[in-house]
Amino acid sequence: MTRLQKLLCLLAMTTLAQASKGELRCGTSLVGDGAWPLEVEKTCGRPDYVSEYPTATMPGLGVVQTEEHWYYNPGPQQFIKRLVFRNGKLVRVDSLGYGFHVARSPSCSTSTLRHAKTEYELIARCGEPASKRVEWQIPSKQKNREHWETTQPVLVQEWLYEFSSNQFRQVVTLRDGQVTDIESRADR
């Protein structure tokens, strides 16, 4: 191995170690687990897209826990980062696919929908949907060897996109902000 190859290998391992620890490098600084949204914004700048969801409600009190997804799109040469905050605390940094250039005015087609992988990509490429449905689903409990696993509710959304009169409506299903299904629907 040449010296350059060793250096690149070391750099790649360092980057992977940071990603696994839930850290995000912004310039010369790092933000990691437990960071406040204000600290992240001060260090990394404003996110490209933010979505917020209630994750727990109590009768008489209303929403008692929230989750925010912050997306940073550095362009086509780097990966999109999704930061997950629970109750105002950074709990996870996800590395998604390569970034992209965002058009000034979104132009959407069924092909664009089929290539989108996240809620951010849908918004950036197609704009807001005509309508949304949001619900929390609890996966069925399964016995894992000798004990029952605890389950976390999963945020499931359906986004309806309408196109010209000669195209079917498209319903995009997202689970935890990731596109999982797209189906065509005739006008009703």
Regions found by a protein language model. Name each.
Residues S20-R188:
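Residues within mature, well-folded domains
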Residues L10-A19:
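Hydrophobic h-region of N-terminal signal peptides that target proteins for export
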Residues M1-L8:
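Bacterial N-terminal signal peptides that target proteins for export
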